[in-house]
Amino acid sequence: IHPTCIPVHGDKQSKLTLMSESLRNDGRIWVPKKLEDAKALQAGTKKPTDIPDADRDFYLERRYPAFGNLVPRDVASRAAKERCDAGFGVNNTGLAVFLDFKYAIDRLGEDVVRARYGNLFDMYEEITDENPYKTPMMIFPAIHYTMGGIWVDYELMTSIKGLYAIGEANFSDHGANRLGASALMQGLADGYFVLPYTCLLYTSDAADEGL
């Protein structure tokens, strides 16, 4: 599950669009504290810029002060869904939370933010017709990829003798949700530490059996 995707905005959007997790380095995630504000946002009678900071719930920063908006993907995804399930979602479907760069722009300047995220902001604006420099982005978790699926034994061999599956093709070494770049790490671990021994073991066994 990827927590930083563009939610459904209209009938012509066929899927949720994956954004970069790098956005959470500087963007602050929030929903309204008041349910009536969330309902007004869903109905389109209020804009996010109408809601003062005091009425914004930066729920990841509140729940996880040591990590803030940089919590692992599975934590960010579950927290966003929980807030939306509680009625605090912010787009017309109620299935979105805000990712706000106002604070980064105030702190760093728009030029710095543009240099870091300009291509992502352009993609967001092209899809949503909203300017993320002026109004908060909306994001929602989406299915990113299937975590494994091919059966392997403890030596990473499939049900077909001599055929091994490594990396994300077999299973996840990383628990509830993978961390950034862990696909590479899992492939390296399987390939470097496991396959040289398992393949040699299998080929020696096969030789003994006259195969």
Task: Walk through the language-model features, giving the residues of each.
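FAD-binding beta-loop-beta segment adjacent to the flavin cofactor pocket
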Residues: 145-164
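An anion/pyrophosphate-binding glycine-rich loop and adjacent beta-alpha core
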Residues: 1-126, 197
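Conserved small/polar residues in nucleotide/adenosyl-binding loops
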Residues: 202-207
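Short loop/turn motifs at secondary-structure junctions and domain boundaries
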Residues: 21-22, 140-144
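A conserved FAD-binding loop/helix module that cradles the flavin
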Residues: 174-196
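Short FAD-binding loop at a beta-strand-to-alpha-helix junction that anchors the flavin cofactor
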Residues: 159-177
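Alpha-helix capping and helix-loop boundary segments enriched in small/acidic/polar residues
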Residues: 16-20, 108-111, 134, 154, ...
